[in-house]
Amino acid sequence: MSKGKINVSVENIFPLIKKFLYSDHEIFLRELVSNATDATLKLKHLSSIGELKGNIGDPKIEIKVDKSKKTLSVIDQGIGMTQDEVKKYINEVAFSGAEEFLEKYKDKDNQSNIIGHFGLGFYSSFMVAKKVEIITKSYKKDPAAKWICDGSPEYSLTKFDKKDRGTEIILHIDKDSTEFLEDSRIKTLLEKYNKFMPIPIKFGM
């Protein structure tokens, strides 16, 4: 198991995300589904050029809500990540230059465009979640990994027993955001933001 800080210079990122990034917290779902779609399209590309052996099946994205546990999960069957890739993409790349950028743009009206510039889409999860887990297994032979962060700059990263390729992001929904545990709310958001996605999305029965 490894523990660490995401980046010493970005300890103010989380409050900035909550306060400034989006006045509309609902956009987190669009960002997570977009990331899941990218991971799945990359898998299909690797398969098409022969870098991935075997049948990848018909990968889909699944959204699950567990009201008793107060969690919302976004699950894909895409390329997944190794532990090293989680460290690189979640803990380092996503924060590259973000603090300075957010400070510059936090008073502007075009806040909805900020996230894509720095790969911060994943971190919009913390607008509605008090804790976020990533469980992921790469298409490579590396063991699966589990990353946990409670909205502070500190995280834990461990090996995990996951057999199937892909990534599951589990949001432990904050008490102020329980609307995102309602099926009707999620259906509305998927209709609004993710209606014409190239990968099928499953939610509900």
Where do the protein language model's features map onto the residues?
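Charged, low-complexity intrinsically disordered tails
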Residues: 182-183, 187, 197
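A short amphipathic beta-strand at an alpha->beta junction
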Residues: 198-205
